[in-house]
Structure formats: C-alpha cells, structure tokens
Regions:
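A conserved ligand/cofactor-binding region detector
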Residues: 1-515
Length: 515
C-alpha cells in the first residue's frame, strides 16, 4: 500500500511520489508535532483515517476532474493543518508556472525574488527574437498604457534592423572563424550563430517579449503575487492577477491571502504608496558621465579578522572576540587545495562584505541579475548613461545601421519619458543602453560570481564587470582574494561558444557509445 507513495519502505532516506503537493506539505508539517515516521503518519493519520479526506483526494490523482481534485486538496489542507502556522507550512509545497509573452522588464520583476523561486528565461544567445507573432507583428509588449505614437515606430525599427542583420552577420562571422579540424558542423554553426545573436542583442528593446519558467514554494509565490500587484507597471499588476488565477488552480491554500482584502491587497497598496512617497524625495535628472564602470563603494578594513573568527568559531569553545589566528595559515588551510570552482569557498568568507555601484549595459545586467546570494537593486532604464556596441560590428561595416536604430529609439525614449513618464518609457530602450545598479555582496559570493562569470566562453559584457569587481576586491584584500584562482582575467574566447559546443559534442558522442 505504501510503496506507491515512497521510493523505499525500509531506509531512513526516501523521496515522496504520486502525492499531490498539498499532501506532501501536510505530511512534512507533521514532523513538528509527532514522533512518528512520515510513512507511519501517512498510514495512520491519512490513509486509515476516514475523516481525513485522503481517500477521495488520492482517488482524483488518476484522471478525475482536475477542479474537483484541487478543491478536495484545499479542503484536505484546511482540515489537516488547523492550528498550524500557514507561513512555514506553505514552504513545504510548490508549483511550476510558465509565464509566456511577457516583456523583458516584467520578467526582471518576476525574477527579482531571491528566496523560494527559481526562474529560467529564454536566452538571447541561443534563440532568435525576430519571429513574428500570430498577427504578423514583432513580439514586443503592447498595451493601452503604451499608445504613444513613437513607441511602435522605434520598436519596429529596432526589430527590423536586428532581423535583417542576423544572416549577413552570421555569414561574416563564419568567414572570420572557419570550421577547424576536429570540430563538427553542428558545433561550428551553433557557436557562430550564438556569436551573431550576442552581437545583436543590444538592439532588442526592453519591451521584447520573452518566456520564462518559475518553480517556487507557496510562501514565495504568495509574496511574489502581492509584490507584483503593487508594481508601478500595469503589465506587472496584470501578471499578479494572472499568477493568482493559475496558482489558485493548483495550490489554492498557499496563495489564498496574496490578494485578499485582509492581507494581500493592503500590502500591495502599501508597496505602491511607499514607492510614491520615496520617489518624491529622490533626486531626478542628475547628469553624470556616460560609459560603463564598476566602483567599490564600501569594504570592511577589519574583514580578515572577522573571517578568521568565523572560521575558528564552530571548532572552538572561546567567544567571538577572543578568537584570533594567523590569517595566512588559516586561509591556506581552508582554501589552499581548491581544485576547481565547484569546490566552494567556506561560509566564513561571508563575513567580508563589499558594496559596488555598477554601470553596464542592460543586457549584462540581465545576466548578472540572476545571482541570489547578495542584495541588489537598479535604477530605471534610460538613455542618459550611453550605450555599448560590440567592436566586431564596425569590423564588418554594420555599426552604422545599428547606431541609427538605437539612436532613433533614444529620441523616442526622450519623448515618451516627457509624455508618459520614466517607468513606461523604459519599454522602448534597447538592451545596449547602460543602467546603474548596486551589489552588496560577501566574499564567498564574489568567489562564486567572479569565477563563474569570467569563464572564457562568457559574454564579454558581463565578463568585464566580474573582472573589475574581482580586481577591486584584490586591491583592498589581496590575501582574501588570492584563492579565487579560477577567476579568468584574460581576454576570453573570440568565438565564445566554440569551446562549449565542442564539449557538448564530446558528451553527445559519449552518450551514443553507451546506448
């Protein structure tokens, strides 16, 4: 009977299967209130307890009406979890949600959640964005709030330029990087196409439609919905309603408060009100020099001592202030034998803290925004900080067309900002334009971020940011930084994806040999 629901019946570690999310969450919640094993709880309190509702719920798993199943699950949850705190229990069950045809701006708002939600988004490196929609038009966000006469003209021009340059640029790249010995045609074509898309991604406006998948727990989704409901963009507020409607069909008990009159709606209104009140105090129209840059705003002069104390603390019986040691010897013991970047730096390094202000193009921001073990926020996307163009576009004579489309979009942005406000004007800004944001990050995450984002196959825009961050940390804390030995400060691969695609071929070949 129980074998259907667990991966084994006789070992202390096992996985759950063939159970609705709400039942899994309810089962795990019982760990805090019973001495029984989970398998015994399922048998005694769920399967053999007629009033639990489990029989009806389990019976809906195989083909019964989905709506009936969900409502039974909600009733089950309420019955079993009376007296439990909803918040912690809501972290014990989750859902997968697909969000399609949303703007890049809205995608960033969805992905801004740091804990409890894991996103994955359509890539500008591997996927063309010029395929028309069912109505034959380019895929960028349109809505009544974006009825400005310049918006669609500028966005269409950006997409048209992007679309018309993909094939000739790909051919030019293939002439510059011909097929080499030992490289398959598949790998070569994939690497050269990715290079072309990388070089042209700066043309895409922030209103470009993208797709993403979200996996998260109920508590995280509840807050995401509330936060989106208080967003300044109408598109994001609409997504709050869409997310709530769809999640109410699969995990209703976990998102029931997200927009309700008692909790969710007042919280969303408060988010909106605080933003408006704070905005009135924030200076605007400040002019600063254009161009990318990374600035170290803050660092802790006492970081070495704190790292030493944090490393010794769990192994000592002394108090924090009494813990002292030789930083060089301790760092060598903890990090001296690191063989690759996947051998993580220890938690003690989290006690060295840094704050950076970064100005880089919005495309690079999108890549670095994915990092979670830090605090970050950005300013509104605009055109005042200038934009980047890949050097390779000038080498093939395509920079003129790209500049023309980008600068026409900048003029449209100026008029939209005047007429519709800076938030809505973001939609027309190409990804090539710079945005300013901050990172507050610890040294452990510096190791992870900089070693990952400086690999030779990475995009040069975010490689440069990661290299600058690491250079600045190395200047103030050379001894703490020296063991991040897998940071690559070199120029990177000219054809960034060539090495990765060749490795993929090797993996595919090995897989074929085993089958």
């Amino acid at each position: 009977m129980l074998a259907r629901y667990f991966t084994n019946l006789d070992r202390p570690v096992f996985a759950l299967r063939n159970l609705p999310e709400v039942v899994k969450g309810a089962l795990f919640s019982r760990y805090s209130r019973t001495e029984k094993s989970l398998r015994r709880v399922l048998l005694d309190e769920f399967i053999n307890e007629p009033d639990s509702g489990f029989a009806q719920l389990a019976g809906t798993q195989a083909g019964a009406d989905d709506m009936v199943a969900v409502r039974r699950a909600e009733e089950f949850y309420e019955r079993v979890l009376v007296g439990y705190g909803d918040d912690s229990v809501a972290e014990l069950a989750g859902a997968h949600v697909a969000v399609e045809r949303v703007s890049t701006l809205a995608a960033k708002a969805l992905e801004d959640s740091r804990i409890g939600i894991s996103p994955l988004e359509k890539s500008t490196r591997y996927v063309r964005f010029d395929r028309p929609g069912p109505d034959g038009r380019y895929l960028y966000h349109r809505g009544p709030e974006l009825a400005h006469p310049d918006y669609e003209v500028a966005a269409d021009s950006l997409f048209k330029t992007y679309s018309e340059l993909i094939e000739p640029l790909t051919l030019a790249i293939r002439e510059r990087f011909p097929l080499v010995e030992g490289e398959t045609d598949r790998a070569w074509k994939a690497a050269t196409r990715a290079k072309a898309l990388d070089m042209l991604r700066g043309l895409l406006p922030a209103g470009t439609l993208t797709n993403l998948g979200l996996f998260g727990n109920g508590r995280a989704f509840e807050y995401l919905i509330t936060k989106m409901a208080g967003h300044e963009l109408p598109e994001c507020r609409g997504l709050a309603q869409d997310l709530h409607r769809e999640l109410d069909l699969v995990i209703p008990s976990f998102v029931k408060r997200a927009l309700d009159d008692r909790y969710g709606a007042p919280a969303a209104e408060r988010i909106s009100r605080i933003r408006a009140e704070t905005a009135r105090m924030a200076p605007r129209n400040h002019r600063s020099g254009a161009g990318p840059r990374v600035t170290l705003l803050e660092h802790d002069p006492d970081a070495e001592r704190k790292v030493v104390a944090a490393a010794l603390f769990p192994l000592s019986d002394a108090g924090w202030k009494e813990l002292e040691g030789d930083p060089a010897a301790l760092l060598e013991a903890m990090l001296g034998d690191r063989g690759n970047r996947r051998q993580r730096a220890p938690r003690a390094l989290e006690h060295a803290q840094y704050a950076f202000e970064i100005v880089a193009n919005f495309a690079a921001y999108r890549d670095l925004h994915r990092h979670r073990m830090l605090t970050q926020d950005r300013q509104l996307l605009g055109t005042a900080l200038g934009y980047d163009l890949p050097i390779g576009l000038a080498e093939v004579g395509m920079d003129g067309r790209v500049r023309s489309a980008i600068e026409a979009a900048a003029e449209a942005h100026s008029r939209m900002e005047r007429d519709a406000g800076p938030a809505l004007a973001q939609y027309v800004v190409p990804l090539a334009f710079h945005v300013r944001w901050y990172f507050r990050v610890n040294l452990r995450e510096i190791y992870h971020l900089c070693e990952l984002r400086t690999t030779p196959q990475g995009h040069p825009d975010y490689r440069w940011v990661a290299q600058e961050m690491f250079r600045l940390v190395s200047e103030v804390h050379p001894r703490l930084a020296r063991y991040a030995r897998f940071v690559d400060m070199g120029p990177g691969d000219e054809l960034e994806r060539r090495r990765s695609e060749r490795r993929m071929d090797e993996k595919l070949s090995a897989l074929d040999r085993t089958q």
